[in-house]
Amino acid sequence: MSKNFEWITPDSDLLEKEITQIQPPKKYNVVLNNDDYTPMDFVIDVLERFFSHDLDKATQIMLKVHYEGKAICGTYSAEIAETKVAQVTMYSRENEHPLLCTMEQA
């Protein structure tokens, strides 16, 4: 009984096709949007608490939100970005602030 086997060699097309189909997961930016009611110190607190920024970096991002209308807080995989948006939104509502946090594809 003889069986025919097709051997995969390093230069075969099959191996190359398998490798080219693998892609890294998409990344998403978590963005804070400016409003006229949320205090600046609360925005800094959010950036330190949920995004682990130090005071200087949090202040820079807060000022960018204030003057440019929005700023990126961090870039994450989809699941982590969704979690960050939900955490910030819930924390803002608990403290009665209308801070808007969104995510967009990087």
UniProtKB/Swiss-Prot annotation:
Q: Where is the signal peptide?
A: none
Cited Pfam families: ClpS
The Gene Ontology biological process terms listed for this entry are: protein catabolic process; proteolysis
Name the family.
Belongs to the ClpS family.
What is the protein's known function? Involved in the modulation of the specificity of the ClpAP-mediated ATP-dependent protein degradation.
Q: What do we know about how this protein assembles, alone or with others? A: Binds to the N-terminal domain of the chaperone ClpA.
Q: What is this protein called?
A: ATP-dependent Clp protease adapter protein ClpS
Query: Which species is this record about?
Result: Vibrio vulnificus (strain YJ016)
Biological classification of the source: Bacteria, Pseudomonadati, Pseudomonadota, Gammaproteobacteria, Vibrionales
Task: Identify the gene encoding this protein.
Answer: clpS
